[in-house]
Amino acid sequence: MVKTALLHNKVLAFPTETFYGLGGNAFFKEVADRVYNIKERPRNKPLLVLTTPEWLPGLCLWNDSRIDDLMNAFWPGPLTLILAANPELPQHLQNSDGTLAVRYTSAPAAQCLIELGSCPIIGTSANLTGMPECSTATEVHNQLNNKVDVIIDGGELEENRASTILNCQNNLFEVLRHGVITSAEINLICEVS
């Protein structure tokens, strides 16, 4: 059922290492469109892509050893990196500035989805824009009112903090959202603002 959903433009909710995520096959524009509609998310707010190392070179471009150092230190885990998108990616995956937010997730359910679908997955939080993130499958069900095709129940998630988002596009990397991984921890690897 889950594999079929990934191959047929379906939207799934699933546990991650932070909150429940919402997404599906990242290469299907219809999935991205449905995620925006379900979340009532403004189209100018880009979506995050959860990936594994083997997909990363096809998604993003970088030539900075600090990025490799960050990946080695914090991945898999709750660090989202904003990198230059591969220009060959479908437009629905690229931000207007040619970037892509990516994370190599440590969550077994999300890793399983990537493996089952043989694709990276959209992995934004499973909540309505402006509402609290969901820590249980029941919260996802109640908040999103049956708009999701499949909900994978991973129990109650304990972290209750979002991933840290780090923009790696300038000489001085910038923390855009403080989350599980602190600026102090990142500064041990490379300087950030």
What is each PLM-predicted segment?
Residues 1-193:
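Active-site-adjacent structural elements in enzyme catalytic cores
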